Amino acid sequence: MIRVYAPASADHLRRLADDRPLEIEVLTAASEDEEDEYDALLVAAEDAPVVITAELDDADAPIRPQDVRAFHLDADGSGDLAWYAPQELDQVLALLDT
C-alpha cells in the first residue's frame, strides 16, 4: 500500500460523499519517515483547502471512499491542519461551506 496526499476542494469531497471514485493529482512522501510524510502533507495543503490522506495499491489509482484514511484542513485559520476521520466527511464539508 502507498500512502498518498491529495489536495482537494469541496467538489472533490462531494464526489467521495456520493460514493464516486476520485481521479486527482496526488503527492507521495520521499520515504516512510514521519517527517517526509508530514512534508508531503504540508506541500499538498498549499494547493487546496483540504488534503485527503489515502492508502492505495497504486499511486495512479483513483481514490475511493474506502481508501481514505483522513482529511486535513485549517479549520480555524491558524495555519495548523486539523485531522478528521473518514466518517467526518459531512463535518468537513460543512466547515468548507461556511
Where are the predicted features?
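Generic hydrophobic segment detector
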Residues: I2-D11, A45-T53, D97-T98
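Short, extreme N-terminal segment that most often corresponds to the first beta-strand
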Residues: M1-E25
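ADP-ribosyltransferase catalytic core
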Residues: A17-F71
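Generic detector of well-ordered alpha-helical segments enriched in charged/polar residues
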Residues: R14, L42-A45, D90-L93
